[in-house]
Amino acid sequence: MLLCDIGNTTYHFFDENSSYKEDAKLFNPSSIKREVFYICVNSSVKERLSLLDNWIDLSLHVDMSRYYKTMGIDRIMACEAIESGVVVDAGSAITVDIIKNGNFEGGFIYAGVKAMNECYKNISAQLEYSFNFELDLDKMPKNSRDAISYGYLGLLYKEVASYGMKIYLTGGDAGQFSKLFLNSDVDELLLFKGMKNIMKKANLC
């Protein structure tokens, strides 16, 4: 079984033995002859894949009545991976979604680390600091780096922790956020687990 998560810059493949990426501009999807079950947020790639019979779009097998129309398919798959908990996908944007007993309860979107760094930098060169993910949030900051870190990370931490649920971290900055959410589970393959669950529901495997 070959799964693929396609973003704007890469094809991210996963099977039972390995995980690897291909450049979205250079990779030729017709070079793969076996069945590929995929999700895609890249409209031009998705149009190209629609012409290939062995590439199967899993978004067509999602019960969208459980979500909202404009919700990203990558967020949906991460939600499908768990029964209950908070999914924090820390990528270019940070998405936080609540799942209770297999039902999507809602979520919100927060600026990603790089975007927020740029935001502070654009306000003033004096605010160009990396965030301190090991900040003690029980103490008010007494320096600029900790002050911007507290403003950015503290609000997110308190909101996520307030739900009192198990926290699942995924995405490129998950490792950084694991320093903040100490009892969280970091799972870079969470989205693929959701894809497998959709396949089971649709009797595709």
From Swiss-Prot:
SUPFAM superfamilies: Actin-like ATPase domain (SSF53067). It comes from the Bacteria. GO terms for cellular component: cytoplasm. A monovalent cation. Ammonium or potassium. GO terms for molecular function: ATP binding; metal ion binding; pantothenate kinase activity. The keyword ATP-binding applies. Substrate binds at residues 68, 72-75, 144. The keyword Cytoplasm applies. It catalyses: (R)-pantothenate + ATP = (R)-4'-phosphopantothenate + ADP + H(+). The active site is at 74 (proton acceptor). Keywords: ATP-binding, Coenzyme A biosynthesis, Cytoplasm, Kinase, Metal-binding, Nucleotide-binding, Potassium, Transferase. ATP binds at residues 5-12, 92. One of its GO terms (biological process) is coenzyme A biosynthetic process. Its EC number is 2.7.1.33. It holds the Pfam family Pan_kinase. InterPro entries: ATPase_NBD, Type_III_PanK. Pathway: Cofactor biosynthesis; coenzyme A biosynthesis; CoA from (R)-pantothenate: step 1/5. PANTHER family: TYPE III PANTOTHENATE KINASE. Catalyzes the phosphorylation of pantothenate (Pan), the first step in CoA biosynthesis. Homodimer. This is Type III pantothenate kinase. The gene is coaX.
